[in-house]
Swiss-Prot record:
Family to which this protein belongs: Belongs to the UPF0346 family.
Listed name of the protein: UPF0346 protein LCA_0996
Record organism: Latilactobacillus sakei subsp. sakei (strain 23K) (Lactobacillus sakei subsp. sakei)
Listed InterPro entries: UPF0346 (IPR010673), YozE_SAM-like (IPR023089), YozE_SAM-like_sf (IPR036806)
HAMAP family: UPF0346
Stored Pfam families: YozE_SAM_like (PF06855)
Coiled-coil regions listed in the entry: none
Highest taxon, organism lineage: Bacteria
Length: 74
C-alpha cells in the first residue's frame, strides 16, 4: 500500500539536522492543516503555495517529493 507523502516526510524529521528537507519535515509536523493522507503532487503543491509559509522555497518540496517517489519505487 502506498504511503502518503506526509508519512514519508515524517521519516525525514530530525531536529538536529539543518538540511532543507529535514527542516521542511520538522515544520510540517507542526502544521495542523497539512494534508496528511495526500500523495498527489499538484494538491500538495497548491496547499504549500497557499499555506506553507515555513517553506522558504518550493524547490525544497520538489526535492522531498522526488525522494518520496523514489522510496515508493523501492
Amino acid at each position: 500500500m502506498k504511503q502518503s507523502f506526509y508519512r514519508y516526510l515524517m521519516t525525514q524529521r530530525d531536529p538536529n539536522n539543518y538540511e532543507p528537507v529535514a527542516q521542511f519535515a520538522n515544520n510540517a509536523f507542526f502544521d495542523q492543516s497539512f494534508p496528511k493522507h495526500e500523495g498527489d503532487y499538484e494538491l500538495l503543491s497548491q496547499y504549500l503555495e497557499l499555506n506553507g509559509s515555513y517553506l522558504p522555497s518550493m524547490l525544497i518540496f520538489d526535492e522531498a517529493y522526488q525522494l518520496y517517489q523514489e522510496s515508493e519505487q523501492a
